[in-house]
């Protein structure tokens, strides 16, 4: 089977991302087994970067 349009049509059967157990966002990748938002499944620590400020607003932190 090729890698073109026909195989891409099979991607609509199962969801790529489901709700994460840790952060609650719909960012847990089923195939890869980790959350794109908080890093659950890949790391014990929360995924956070200085260039990302949404998590600061969500948690009401001031640093």
Curated annotation (Swiss-Prot):
It holds the Pfam family Ribosomal_L37e. Binds 1 zinc ion per subunit. InterPro entries: Ribosomal_eL37 (IPR001569), Ribosomal_eL37/eL43 (IPR011331), Ribosomal_eL37_CS (IPR018267), Ribosomal_zn-bd (IPR011332). HAMAP family: Ribosomal_eL37 (MF_00547). GO terms for molecular function: rRNA binding; structural constituent of ribosome; zinc ion binding. GO terms for biological process: translation. Belongs to the eukaryotic ribosomal protein eL37 family. Binds to the 23S rRNA. It comes from the Archaea. It comes from Thermococcus gammatolerans (strain DSM 15229 / JCM 11827 / EJ3). One of its GO terms (cellular component) is cytosolic large ribosomal subunit. Its cofactor is Zn(2+). This is Large ribosomal subunit protein eL37. PROSITE patterns: RIBOSOMAL_L37E. Zn(2+) binds at residues 20, 23, 35, 38. Keywords: Metal-binding, Ribonucleoprotein, Ribosomal protein, RNA-binding, rRNA-binding, Zinc, Zinc-finger. The keyword Membrane does not apply. A zinc finger (C4-type) spans 20-38.
